[in-house]
Amino acid sequence: KNNLKQSKISISLDKGVFSELYQDIYFDKTNCIQESKHVYLDTNNLEKKFKNINNYIIAELGFGTGLNFILSWDLWNKNHIKNSSLLYISYESAPISIEQIKNIHKLFIGLSHLSKILIQKLPQIWQGTHQIFFEFGNVTLILIYNDFLSLKNFSFKADTWYLDGFSPTKNSSAWSNELYNEIYKHTKDGGSLSTYTVAGHVRRGLSDAGFNISKIKGIGNKREILYGYKNKVNCKTTKKPVLRYNDIGPVAVIGAGISGASLIYFLKKRNID
């Protein structure tokens, strides 16, 4: 069953980057980078965390234009410690076409070096899980084109969640108690989340799921945003992050040489023996 919706985008001076499907903006053209940095990166204190945590996992509901990913990748590049990795798991139920993303990314001043690499590696739009490697495999983007509740089929725990699924009044499927419970299950002890919406039912739903939720100062037109965290029990880990999303394996590679070695490398990256 194909659960993907067809995204329709318009760009204008008054509406910014606008979703015709959800009748809501992705972001204001003039302030998009500052807003995303504040709501997601700064609120979750990622600069400090990247300097202190070896293997970091960010999960996101709403890949959208890829802006949050590029900003996180850029921040990690500037602040990560030696031999560390970034795993970025993002869900999207209405993917934007690569051509539209190219046009939108022209707005991302100062990020073109990463934007070009991402656009070159973006997959074609088909429902499923797409794994993309950057920085010699130290940054991994797992892009899941499916509905958000497909989260139930994956086994991982994130250090940080970005909840970026349009307004609850425009896209109710991104804001349900069932989904909040799944997010909580998929969050490490001591892990955090943030979102631009402060709707009462979102605050209550995340709180009922187990998060400590508070409203904090926003930016621009967003006067307040939400920040939450999961109580810290023991979040120390030395293991490299693993995302399990299939039961493939073991796999036998017949033949040596560059092709065989490359295949073994990528199977290992997908945790397939």
Language model region names:
Residues K1-Y56, W73-G110:
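Rossmann-like AdoMet
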Residues L61-G64, G255-G257:
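Glycine-rich Rossmann-fold phosphate-binding loop(s) that bind the pyrophosphate
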Residues T65-I70, A261:
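Glycine-rich SAM-binding Motif I of class I
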Residues K102-N153:
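S-adenosyl-L-methionine
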Residues S176-D189:
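A short glycine-rich, Lys/Arg-flanked "PGG" loop and its adjoining helix->strand segment in the class I
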Residues G190-T197:
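Conserved beta-strand signature within the Rossmann-like core of class I S-adenosyl-L-methionine
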Residues K215-P250:
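Core SAM-dependent methyltransferase catalytic element
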